[in-house]
């Protein structure tokens, strides 16, 4: 027999018949239907909604609404302004390694990002992970180029 979509059946015992509660004592789930004698959990309209704490102000309403969320994996950069690049001689290539060697950056823990504060007079080829729009405009206005590293 080939396996066809219309011939599929669930495994034996995989689908149980729905238990009909409250249909007489002999049915096994009659009278109180397994809900106990009294109390909120035995009443009609049960169960209570998730987060319900018996009438007291629930936790999700007690805590303040937060206006923002923190990123799980935030990107961190070693930032450097365009004005700091004036110390480097014109025509050279600037990257994180050369900045550490020149002593401009002291602790290179993360990729380099160039910010646009200040003015740039020298023509440089700058290699960095990210540039702000103003930094890119100032480097290119001075005759230099921006190379984005991955």
UniProtKB/Swiss-Prot annotation:
InterPro entries per UniProt: Ribosomal_uL15, Ribosomal_uL15/eL18, Ribosomal_uL15/eL18_sf, Ribosomal_uL15_bac-type, Ribosomal_uL15_CS
Output the superkingdom of the source species: Bacteria
Which residues lie in coiled coils? none
Q: Could you state one GO biological process linked to this protein?
A: translation
Among Gene3D superfamilies, the record links this protein to: 3.100.10.10
NCBIfam families, alphabetized: rplO_bact
Entry's PANTHER family? Answer: 50S RIBOSOMAL PROTEIN L15 (PTHR12934), LARGE RIBOSOMAL SUBUNIT PROTEIN UL15M (PTHR12934:SF11)
Q: What is this protein called?
A: Large ribosomal subunit protein uL15
Species annotation: Synechococcus sp. (strain CC9311)
- Upper taxonomic classification of the species? Bacteria, Bacillati, Cyanobacteriota, Cyanophyceae, Synechococcales
Q: Which gene encodes it?
A: rplO
